Amino acid sequence: LASHGYVMVSVDQNACNMLSGENDGRAVLLLENIGLLLGYNEEEGNPLEGMLDADNIAIAGHSRGGEMVATAYLFNGYDNYPENGNVDFDYHYNIRSIIAIAPTVDQYKPADHSVELEDVNYLLLHGACDRDVTNFQGMAQYEHITYTSEGDYLKTALYIAGANHGQF
């Protein structure tokens, strides 16, 4: 798929599971990994050289990762970390789509506000038999996505009968 611009990467963030208040760190970790991949895309002789479509990036996450991708999209548009203006961000990647699978919501709230997003495709998936995130929390994030431009965007939520938190 890489020859067509598709690369799937799983960023193992399980080490963050024993921490609290870590979702902002998860978002930075994802953005840093995107930067590595895009660097490989530009690196002469790298197997990924010229293979990635840097203009069409989608990010996906499950559970806390499902919340994290919304935070990553938010941070992607910032020049500084919202909790400390002395920490510079230099991301600004062309993230076009977010896929949130059974996400948590509001574990990270910049300046004590829910994460609000603009102008991004958003797919929310949640299982009706989820016993971990039991109340379709992702709908709260879904409601905090707005569109300001005339571009074509898709925002949809699917509540899937028979699916639980980890097996779809």
Kindly label every feature range from the protein language model.
Residues 17-20, 68, 106-111, 132-135, ...:
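Extracytoplasmic/secreted cell-surface and envelope-processing proteins
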Residues 6, 13-15, 103, 162:
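Active-site loop/turn elements of alpha/beta-hydrolase fold enzymes
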Residues 21-64:
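Gly/Ser-rich "nucleophile elbow"/oxyanion-hole loop immediately N-terminal to the catalytic nucleophile
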Residues 52-54, 95, 154:
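Core-facing hydrophobic residues within beta-strands of well-ordered domains
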Residues 66-78:
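Short glycine-enriched nucleophile-adjacent loop
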Residues 115-168:
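Active-site-adjacent alpha-helix of alpha/beta-hydrolase-fold enzymes
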Residues 1-9:
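Short amphipathic alpha-helix adjacent to the substrate-entry channel of hydrolases
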